[in-house]
UniProtKB/Swiss-Prot annotation:
Domain TNase-like: 58-263
Name of the gene this protein is made from: LCL3
Keyword vocabulary terms for this entry: Calcium, Endonuclease, Hydrolase, Membrane, Metal-binding, Mitochondrion, Nuclease, Transmembrane, Transmembrane helix
Spans through the membrane: 15-37
Name of the featured protein: Probable endonuclease LCL3
């Protein structure tokens, strides 16, 4: 074999090795990109699709597009936020604005002397902030946006008063809890820590959001406001190892007669559900 043939064989062998190496690099990069996308950037559109490794360990980021009750809402998952392309490469839904005054419940303004005196007293003592009137007057700037690929979220550790469903009457402070939650969350971005999936295929979660006071645990805030009680179920209760906090703030709200604890006779959501099932 001549020197020229040997050189050609060497070049062909080197070229083949380079092609194989390049193919492996491209394949590896592609597989790595797919794995990274699935793990960090793939949108979750229902609770049953949440990967097992996320429960109790990782957080989901997204926008609240609908609040249907005092202890649950719908989350439009936006993994990676702006770095995941949301808002410039991937579309984020815009919620329709509510009516000009933003009030959910219309209340007649009465000139009753006693009512005016009572409200003045509540405002003077600071208890007005936890009264039914205060919560009903909260403004909600957006309307719910339905029919989206969203994850239904159930707030962990709490039960809010039941609203009117299937012909059943609403509990006191059911509307107040709904309005407060809409005022606090609707149209905003939140962090959600998945804990479990309940019988209705909702993701029971710890939910936090940012405001000028810092990060706030929404479930805990509802207990502090007197708009929810600590979850009464013996099974499937999720506290994310913070049950003592919820119990402490429930006792405090009860002692200070905040929200639903202002009533003379209390019927908890758990007691109400048992009653209507009979």
């Amino acid at each position: 074999m001549s020197d020229i043939d040997e050189k050609n064989d060497t070049k062909e062998s080197s070229f083949s090795s380079d092609v194989v190496l390049l193919s492996l690099l491209i394949s590896g990069s592609t597989l790595g990109a797919i794995a990274g996308y699935n793990r960090y950037l793939k949108q979750v559109t229902k609770a049953t699709d949440i990967p097992n490794y996320m429960f109790r360990k990782r957080w989901m980021y997204g926008k609240v597009t609908a609040v249907g009750d005092g202890d649950n809402f719908h989350l439009f998952h936006t993994p990676g936020g702006i770095f995941g392309g949301w808002g410039w490469l991937r579309k984020v839904p815009k919620l329709p604005k509510s009516d000009s005054n933003g009030l959910i419940v219309s209340r007649k303004k009465t000139s009753n002397f006693y009512s005016g005196l009572k409200n003045s007293y509540h405002k003077f003592t600071g208890s007005y902030r936890y009264s039914s009137e205060y919560f009903l007057d909260l403004k909600v700037p957006y309307k719910n946006l339905r029919n989206l690929p969203t994850v239904p979220i159930r707030l962990c550790a709490i039960d809010a008063p039941e609203r009117a469903h299937f012909g059943n009457t609403s509990q006191p402070y059911g509307d107040e809890a709904l309005i407060w939650l809409r005022n606090r969350l609707l149209g905003k971005y939140v962090w959600v820590k998945p804990l479990s999936v309940d019988q209705y295929n909702r993701c029971v979660s710890k939910v936090v959001c940012w405001n000028w006071l810092g990060w706030q645990n929404i479930s805990l805030q509802m207990v502090r406001q007197g708009l929810a009680v600590v979850y009464e179920g013996k099974t499937s209760a999720e506290f994310d190892r913070e049950e003592f906090l919820y119990r402490f703030y429930e006792r405090r709200s009860k002692a200070k007669k905040r929200g639903l604890w202002r009533q003379r006779v209390i019927e908890t959501p758990g007691e109400y559900k048992k009653k209507i099932k009979k």
